[in-house]
Every structure is written in structure tokens, then in C-alpha cells.
Amino acid sequence: MCALVSRHVAIHSKDMHVSLLDQNSSIRSKLIQETVANKCIKNTDTVVPILDISAGEINPADISMCDTRFKSECGNPSTRKDCTYEDKQLDNRRIHLWGAVSKPGLGIITIPEVRDRNHDKTYIIVENRANATAVLCREGDSGAMVCADDDYGSGVEAISMLIGKDTTNPGKYATFRIDKGLQQLEKQTDSSFSLCQD
């Protein structure tokens, strides 16, 4: 089992470990070197820039302390559902995250597909909900999973992973599709990655 962390956090680890904290426990996770390295992924004829995601292995003795369930907007542990929506179908979708600081952060997807031509990457832009009393996220929340309650009340969809705030547009934040992040980890490590099922 692995923990997913922001690469921009992982690269600052002096001993290739990160601490994973919740209300009841602290676990140290050993970062997988290939997911932290500052390099592009080489495909057959192209070079693909990397997304802001790294992985750390959980010690088997610590796995029982991990709660792998996703939380609904109300904070209830819930069944994880795969997000099968195309990018454009995510427009105006109400989302939430449970980060290190924001518990919860509430937002909305406002731009479901932004292409960064300089780096050949695609992002999803999310922002604070109108009339919300709190912001979607705060410093320290990067790496949080951006989720949406399933339209039919049967679980939580994991959509993307939070990178951080858009410094040029207050109240807006950049994320990337989590399936793209998992694909990157697979290419970097020649291993299989998937989100935990509860």
C-alpha cells in the first residue's frame, strides 16, 4: 500500500520519508525514489512532463492504522466510486476535500480542462463556492483528493488531486485528474497503482 503525496512536498524530504498524520496516529512513509526524481517520463518518441504527485510505501505493520475510505461532503466515510465523467461534464460540479487544514473545503469546478501548452499538461480549475463562509483550501492542503458526492447518494467520486492556489487568480486552485496521476506513477515505477477500495 502506498500514500499519495504532492511531489512539491516530497522533494524537500531530507531522508526520503514523509509523515502522514491524522487525529489519532502518525505514520512514516518511505518515498519511492522514481516518483520524486526531477525528470520527465520518456515515452517512445516523446517526453512527458511530470505532474505534482509522488508515492510513499506504507510499512506493512502500519497498514492497519490507515483509513482508506473517502469522506462525503458531510464527513461520513463512504464507498469510493470511479469518476467516469469526461472533463467537460465536470463543469459546475460541486466538490469537496478533506485536507490537512480544511475539514472540509467546499468548492466547485469552474474550468474542467485547462491545457498548459508550455508543459503539455492538462489541469482542472476549482474555486470557492459562491456565498461560502470558508475557502476551499488553505496552505498545507496540497495533495488532498478533490471529490464529489455521487449524484445517486451511493458513494464519493475521487476526481482530482489538489496542487495549490492560482497565484494570479485569488480563490481559484489548480488540480489534476487523479487517473492521470496514477498513470504517471505506473510509468515511473513499472508498477500498478489504483485507489484503495473500502
Name the predicted role of every residue range.
Residues 168-176:
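A short, polar/charged loop-to-alpha-helix boundary motif
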Residues 151, 166-169:
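Active-site signature of cysteine proteases
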Residues 1-139, 147-150, 163, 175-182, ...:
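Serine endopeptidase catalytic core focused on the charge-relay Asp
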